[in-house]
Amino acid sequence: QQRGLNIVQADIEGGLNLFGDAAFDLVILSQTLQATRHTEALVNEVLRVGKSAIVTLPNFGHWSVRWQLGVGGRMPVSKRLPYQWYDTPNVHFSTIRDFDVFCAEKGITVERRAVLAGGREISLLPNVRGETAVFQIRR
């Protein structure tokens, strides 16, 4: 703890049962969700222990991913996705729109969504142009 900020680092797939309801003001899942096995259960637990959460995820709907897969016929490799299909930690490949729909179907409120391309926020064609999405969510 420094300056009133508590940070906990743990195996998130091991469960968050050590923490009570609303134990944290904010839980951050940075580039994590796509690498977990039980996505829905994890999001439920994160929103149980946190009053809100920030989730960042890569956009597998980005035009370059579509191009590499559609034209090149291979799973994409890039600076943001530097792994081959056989050694990637990612087990879920989703788009920004997929996460929007997931939240709507599960009764999760998206308080704010920012879509980034080249480090800048964009609004035009976010599911095609966005490289990364940042969602602030709550129940």
Q: Model-found features: residue ranges?
A:
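Structural alpha-helical scaffold elements that stabilize or flank donor/cofactor-binding regions
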Residues: 19-20, 46
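Structured catalytic core of nucleotide-sugar glycosyltransferases
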Residues: 14, 23-26, 42
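Alpha-helix C-terminal capping/helix-to-coil transition sites in glycosyltransferase folds
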Residues: 22-23, 49
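Active-site micro-motifs of SAM-dependent methyltransferase domains
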Residues: 14, 34, 62
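A short SAM/SAH-binding and catalytic strip from SAM-dependent methyltransferases
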Residues: 25-39, 57
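Short, well-ordered beta-strand core segments
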Residues: 7, 27, 52-53
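S-adenosyl-L-methionine-dependent methyltransferase catalytic module, highlighting the catalytic core
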Residues: 40-45, 52-139
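Conserved SAM-binding strand-loop segment of SAM-dependent methyltransferases
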Residues: 3-19
